[in-house]
Amino acid sequence: MRDGPPDTMRDGPPVTLYCFAHAGAGASGFAHWHTQTGPGVHTVPVLLPGRGARRREPRATSREALLEALLKPLAGQVADGRPYVLYGHSLGGVVAHTLARALINRGLPAPACLAVGASPPPQTAPAGHDTDLSDERLLRFAAALGAAPGGALAAPGSLWYRRVLPLLRDDLTLADALRADALADTSGPLPVPVLAVGGQDDPVVGATVLDGWARWTTGRFIRRTVPGDHFFVRGPHAPRLIGRACRVVRRTRLAPAPLSGGKL
């Protein structure tokens, strides 16, 4: 999971920022983050099975399969107690939440912060999200969000249609499974602060939806809005914001203070 040398700061180790992508995607959406999160942050995009370098592995469509693929390597990296933050975009938000809960339930160090972007909380299914959609309607849904290329590039028979559309459908199935499992879990809210980020032009996940994440933490809840649509993760504003959040929680770790002690 680690990629490249970590950033350093004078006072202690950097914060490791584990990033989880939206449905139908690999890790490329975070390729630019390491140059934009700022000092003291080591960015680590995490690749789910069934895509990129893990394309030959079965795609995860259940909580059990997700944890089988990701929990052991992640647990090995956070066990040393160094500060880390989880950020998930869209589907990645419920993936990050699921992993945070699993790590805590196993007695491992909790993330210093759970950050989610363009991600409805478990109690809210995204508008238009339906795993039973026909290929044609699922393609229209993806195109409306900006997740599919236009014209012939996404037409039936195209490479995108044959490879990405099935991945997108399985990822939506995974999202449904993770939401259902979170609602059935009796462990209670996470004992970590939650930062929910929305795009000001996101047609699907607005401020009211993001506010629903407040019930999933016993700590501080903060919501912020950045320029962009549902895929603001591709721009510069999200990594800068999440980078600042990492530095705030790092200072909190060194000298206890509320998350609001730094400007986000």
Model-derived features: where do they sit?
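Non-catalytic, mobile gating and regulatory segments of ester bond hydrolases
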Residues: M1-L264
